[in-house]
Amino acid sequence: MCIRDSCYGIIIYMFFLRILEKLGRKRVVMDRGLSHPEYNLAKPWTDRYYLLFRKRPKWFPFNIFINHIKDNDHGIGLHNHPFPYITIILSGGYWETNIKKERKWRGKFYIGFRSADNLHRVDLEPGIKPITIYIAGPYGLRKKGRSEYGTWK
């Protein structure tokens, strides 16, 4: 039985995610892609729930989804994204490390705006599985190349 009002919010939220899953809007994202040299070691990294497009057309300027992050970024390296993005942490939090090796805690209600060229990594505290709203911006704005696996460049 829920004692606090927040319990009802969690129940409604979990029900909403189940509906998205039943509608085919859930995808398990692995911690490394098919092009990674050690793809055979891939494991689930986040559960992604698509609020707009399951497969966004490249011409459409944005997409919105919920990420339920399950594990740290793999390896020791940084990564970037093919588009600028906004992330809003709804619950939990994570450590974000940047190219300067600055490590900052990003907690509940944190809002981050990032360019497509931003290099970073995400690490979790034990027992914390953050949930974020992620707004992916338009493709084609990354000026640098894709990040290299296992590096800080």
Predicted regions and their residues:
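Conserved short histidine dyad/triad with adjacent acidic residue
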Residues: 65-80, 116
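Short, conserved beta-strand element in jelly-roll/cupin
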Residues: 81-95
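Short acidic-glycine-tyrosine-enriched beta hairpin
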Residues: 98-117
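Active-site or metal-binding loop neighborhoods of secreted/extracellular toxin and effector enzymes
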Residues: 140-153
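A short, N-terminal "cap"/entry segment at the start of jelly-roll beta-barrel domains
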Residues: 9-63
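Short beta-strand His + acidic residue motifs that chelate non-heme Fe in jelly-roll/DSBH
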Residues: 96-97, 119-126
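Short, small-residue-biased leader/transition segments that mark boundaries at the very start
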Residues: 1-3
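A short hydrophobic beta-strand segment most commonly corresponding to one strand
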Residues: 127-143
